[in-house]
Amino acid sequence: KKIEYVLDQVGMTGFEKRPVHTLSGGQKQRLTIACALISNKNFILLDEPTALLDQTSQSKVLQTIKNLTSDNKKPLSALWITHRYEELTYADAVAELKNGFLSSWQEPSKFQYN
């Protein structure tokens, strides 16, 4: 059921049997995210997970990550790297790096982009 849920949430329902080489760049990105979310790991690292996605897919993927990391039945922590300020609203905490060093750690509502 988790597989079906995650595939639906990232917009990949119906693509289960398609060969990967036939998928578009955005579809491959969504499939990669789905695989990470389904993996039963306690921690996942996502580097620019919405980079190749359209606006609708970006929102769905980020909401799915938020939902799965908020599920108290199976703890999942996700660290995602982004340059998109609007994605911060999905985070529980924001760490800002400057020149390779941690310069701040705070709640998303208190973060100010410089």
Each PLM stretch: what is its role?
Residues 1-15:
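Conserved ABC ATPase "signature" region
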Residues 19-23:
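Conserved ABC ATPase signature
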Residues 24-30:
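ABC ATPase nucleotide-binding domain "signature motif"
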Residues 33:
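Hydrophobic anchor residue at the start of the ABC signature
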Residues 44-48:
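Catalytic Walker B motif of ABC-type/P-loop ATPase nucleotide-binding domains
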Residues 55-57:
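Helix N-cap at the start of a conserved alpha-helix in ABC-type nucleotide-binding domains
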Residues 101-114:
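Conserved beta-strand-loop-alpha-helix hinge in the C-terminal portion
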